[in-house]
Amino acid sequence: MPNILSLTCICFNSVIYPTSFFFAKLPEAYAIFNPIVDFMPVIPVLFFLLAFVWQAAVSFR
């Protein structure tokens, strides 16, 4: 039961403050990884596009 309550609170807080979820800043010690972290959401899209390139290479068998 406490797990469900805490999950509900987390979801409720993310609804109230949606910008803090998308624009969170890394701690200063990890600031050098900012470019990598900014690029990470694009990686699944690249795999999706790679599937089409691969299928085109094998003539969509």
UniProtKB/Swiss-Prot annotation:
Domain of life assignment: Eukaryota
Q: Which GO terms describe its biological process?
A: photosynthesis
Q: What sections of the protein cross the membrane?
A: 32-52
The main location is plastid
Q: How does it sit in the membrane?
A: Single-pass membrane protein
Write down any Gene Ontology CC term.
chloroplast thylakoid membrane
Residues that make up the propeptide are 1-24
Tell me where in or outside the cell this protein is found.
Plastid, Chloroplast thylakoid membrane
A Pfam family that the UniProt record links to this protein: PsbK
- Kindly state which keywords UniProt assigns to this record, in alphabetical order: Chloroplast, Membrane, Photosynthesis, Photosystem II, Plastid, Reaction center, Thylakoid, Transmembrane, Transmembrane helix
Q: Per the similarity annotation, which family is this?
A: Belongs to the PsbK family.
Q: What interactions and quaternary structure are annotated? A: PSII is composed of 1 copy each of membrane proteins PsbA, PsbB, PsbC, PsbD, PsbE, PsbF, PsbH, PsbI, PsbJ, PsbK, PsbL, PsbM, PsbT, PsbX, PsbY, PsbZ, Psb30/Ycf12, at least 3 peripheral proteins of the oxygen-evolving complex and a large number of cofactors. It forms dimeric complexes.
Query: What PANTHER family does the database record attribute to this sequence?
Result: PHOTOSYSTEM II REACTION CENTER PROTEIN K, PTHR35325
Q: What does this protein do?
A: One of the components of the core complex of photosystem II (PSII). PSII is a light-driven water:plastoquinone oxidoreductase that uses light energy to abstract electrons from H(2)O, generating O(2) and a proton gradient subsequently used for ATP formation. It consists of a core antenna complex that captures photons, and an electron transfer chain that converts photonic excitation into a charge separation.
- Spell out the protein name for this chain: Photosystem II reaction center protein K
- Write the lineage as a comma-separated list: Eukaryota, Viridiplantae, Streptophyta, Embryophyta, Tracheophyta
